[in-house]
Curated annotation (Swiss-Prot):
Organism, as annotated: Oryza sativa subsp. japonica
Disrupted-gene phenotype: Semi-dwarf phenotype.
Enzyme Commission identifier(s): 1.14.14.86
Similarity field: Belongs to the cytochrome P450 family.
Matches recorded under InterPro entries: Cyt_P450, Cyt_P450_CS, Cyt_P450_E_grp-I, Cyt_P450_sf, KO_chloroplastic
Pathway: Plant hormone biosynthesis; gibberellin biosynthesis
UniProt entry keywords in alphabetical sequence: Heme, Iron, Membrane, Metal-binding, Monooxygenase, NADP, Oxidoreductase, Transmembrane, Transmembrane helix
Protein name as catalogued: Ent-kaurene oxidase 2
Length: 505
């Protein structure tokens, strides 16, 4: 849910322009609030026809929603063109929706861009809760993300962190005074892990029939991750006015379908290459191999599930770890506290995943980062398919629902000084075990994130090793660079840091 962006043919511009002009005339007479049903959530005043779209034009809806929550409360209604949307901004109400009222609100409501990019919900994360969802979630947990499967990939995760540290050491040795770009190093190794898990091999290049040439690993990453994340936030104004769906929006369609076609061509090439290795007896156990053996999926479903596995670690895990290292570099006292905890528990031994349960402050750093920098600020919209109640309010069938995790985690009634990054709020026994997951970064209930265990392993082990090995300091002037971009809370300004070897051995 982004800004109202008219586009496409002149007819579209004229039609929408007329609506906006009418709305502007109405605005002169006073802002008009949506008609309120008895016992309905509070409604944010908007304009005729377009509702509240003009108030979301900054493309940071999670922040706007949080500001409205301070005025209208944790649950309220807005209008986005023809649609009525209930926005939830508190942990209590969000959990009621995701757990207690799950049966009434389990259907995903995707934008036109996401519908195209996910091939109409052909993924674990975006599918409706149905037999298909249960089946494919079982597949990914059994073969890649569950407890047993994670043990299988332990050596690869350890090697990933080792490779990153080796690169950091080399960069520091080559130029001790130059800041390094954290994301460049972390991104490459995460993508390597994703490819090995998904495809059985760290693919350096692949021949794509549609392109008529080999493409590099960087091009593979751009086609399957970067371009897709940017395209996912493309706005089709017809989503808000379905009765105008007949009007062309050529600029949107060209961008989205070109990106999707390119992704499909690259994924087909990667899958074809792995199938050829299987025939030659050279393939290693991986997610694709598991899915092929199950023999229950169409070619399209197979491609989408492998693509989902490819981007799962390569995006949100990067986002969380980069923000954690940003905050530790910005707050040297908290970085020192974490380092001393690691020293007390590990001594001169290298910190490993086995040490993680004995590092409570590291755990606090992780959860506070998830709270302050929610990897996915807005949970993808859901569709209320039967009349229900939320927080005592009546919510009719046909309503869309958005959970604003950013708003939940910045709610002053639930968190003290929420704008500050304070790991201590999760440390020292101040919260019960269940409260550690109050941030809802991994969702809740039957739609909880399948990749939560792997994300925790990677982020916590990486942060611990990075702090054990180096002292971290921000590049001068970067202390307040907290803007985000893309569908996830991707840091707009990549983290630039100065590293100092600790010389622990």
């Amino acid at each position: 849910m982004e800004a109202f962006v008219p586009g496409g043919a002149g007819a579209a511009a004229a039609a929408v322009g007329g609506f906006v002009a009418a709305a502007a005339l109405a605005e002169r007479a006073g802002v008009i609030a949506p008609r309120k049903r008895p016992n309905a959530p509070p409604a944010v005043p908007g304009l005729p026809i377009i509702g509240n779209l003009h108030q979301l034009k900054e493309k940071k809806p999670h922040q706007t929603f949080a500001k409205w929550a301070e005025i209208y409360g944790p649950i309220y209604t807005i209008r986005t063109g023809a649609s009525s949307v209930v926005v939830l901004n508190s942990t209590e109400v969000a959990k009621e929706a995701m757990v207690a009222k799950f049966s009434s609100i389990s259907t995903r409501k995707l934008s036109k861009a996401l519908t195209v990019l996910t091939r109409d919900k052909s993924m674990v994360a975006t599918s409706d809760y149905c037999d298909f969802h249960k089946m494919v979630k079982r597949y990914v947990m059994s073969s890649m993300l569950g407890t047993s499967a994670q043990k299988q990939f332990r050596d690869i995760r350890d090697m990933m962190i080792h490779n990153m540290l080796s690169t950091f050491h080399k960069l520091v040795k080559d130029d001790p005074h130059a800041p390094l770009i954290f994301r460049d190093v972390f991104k490459d190794e995460l993508f390597r892990l994703s490819m090995i898990q998904s495809l059985g091999e760290d693919v350096s290049s692949v021949y794509v029939d549609e392109f008529g040439r080999d493409i590099s690993k960087e091009e593979i990453y751009n086609a399957t991750v970067t371009d897709m994340m940017m395209c996912a936030i493309e706005v089709d104004w017809r989503d808000f006015f379905p009765y105008l769906s007949w009007v062309p929006n050529k600029s949107f369609e060209t961008r989205v379908f070109t990106t999707e076609t390119r992704r499909t061509a690259v994924m087909r090439a990667l899958i074809k290459q792995q199938k050829e290795r299987i025939v030659r007896g050279e393939a290693k156990t991986c997610y694709l191999d598991f899915l092929l053996a199950e023999n229950t999926l169409t070619d399209e479903q197979l491609m989408m599930l492998v693509w989902e596995a490819l981007i799962e670690a390569a995006d949100t895990t990067l986002v969380t770890t980069e923000w954690a290292m940003y905050e530790l570099a910005k707050n040297p006292d908290k970085q020192e506290r974490l380092y001393q905890e690691i020293r007390e528990v590990c001594g001169d031994e290298t910190v490993t995943e086995e040490h993680l349960p004995r590092l409570p402050y590291l755990n606090a750093v992780f959860h506070e980062t998830l709270r302050r920098h929610s990897p996915v600020p807005l949970i993808p919209p859901r569709f209320v398919h039967e009349d229900t109640k939320l927080a005592g309010y009546d919510v009719p069938a046909g309503t869309e629902m958005v959970i604003n995790l950013y708003g939940c985690n910045m709610n002053r009634k639930e968190w003290e000084s929420p704008e500050e990054w304070v790991p201590e709020r999760f440390a020292g026994g101040r919260l019960e075990v269940a409260d550690m997951y109050k941030t809802m970064a991994f969702g809740a209930g039957r739609r909880a994130c399948a990749g939560s265990l792997q994300a925790t392993h990677i982020a916590c082990a990486a942060v611990a090793r990075f702090v054990q090995e180096f002292g971290w300091r921000l590049r001068e002037g970067d202390e307040e660079k907290v803007d985000t971009v893309q569908l996830t809370a991707y840091k707009l300004h990549p983290l630039h840091v100065h590293l100092t070897r600790r010389g622990r051995m």
